[in-house]
Amino acid sequence: MIETLLLVLVCIIIGGLLSSLAVHLMPVGGAPAAMATATGIATGCVMLMTGAAVTGLFTASTVASFWVTKPNVILVALSGAVGSMLMMGFTMFVGNLIYIFGAGIVPCSGRVAVDPITKDSQTEYKTPRTDGHGVPTVSFVSGILGGFSGGFGGALIYVVLVSDSYADFSVATAGIVAMGIFIANAIIAAYNIGGTIEGFHDPKFKARIRTGLTCSLIVSVLCGVIIVIAMLTGTLAGGVM
């Protein structure tokens, strides 16, 4: 019993940390990106990661249903990662289509002079008085990695909660709890970022990722302890699991 409780706690902590890392990897441009004056997707960190998390949980829950009992943790977690990656990939791709063919701009970074992946120069394509625009290659790759990290983390939390070998929560409860832990970490990461971020190449990523992961660790441990208490008592926030 103790081994099971510790395993659930560890998986929740790992899932929370991966969720926080995912938010820092996302190319988020916020309101400025809606006017093509900042690099990234024209939305906030929490909204973007919520969409990725829901997609990942949909695919993870579908794959988990293939087993009557004891779903394969790794396969379910990977399925969640793939679902989130696809969601992020399509979102960034369609966003670039609108930027390129709708607004007539070239996706480029406002934080680096040369794309670290393609080695293409960015400066001459950046519109004056903007912080870049669109989703350049390095941001696209960073977003895909963020989708993988967040989807894997969220699905990992879900599968250990729903599996009868571990927490044995109902499907609905496991989904709600996994989503709650994911969003809690996403909100804290969003406050840590404090605006827009382009991805792992952004100086803001290197400067703030350690603080973000530290805060995520604290939150994830707290959430994990609550889950362990729920497992021991058979209740969750006063309700039956």
Language-model segment annotations:
Residues 81-104, 187:
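Hydrophobic alpha-helical membrane-embedded segments
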Residues 2, 6, 70, 74, ...:
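C-terminal transmembrane helix-loop-helix hairpin of multi-pass membrane proteins
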Residues 7-28:
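N-terminal signal-anchor/start-transfer transmembrane helix
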Residues 103-129, 200-203:
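Juxtamembrane inter-helical linkers in multi-pass membrane proteins
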Residues 30-47, 171-175:
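Loop-to-helix transition at the N-terminal end of transmembrane alpha-helices
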Residues 59-92:
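Alpha-helical transmembrane-segment detector that highlights a single hydrophobic TM helix
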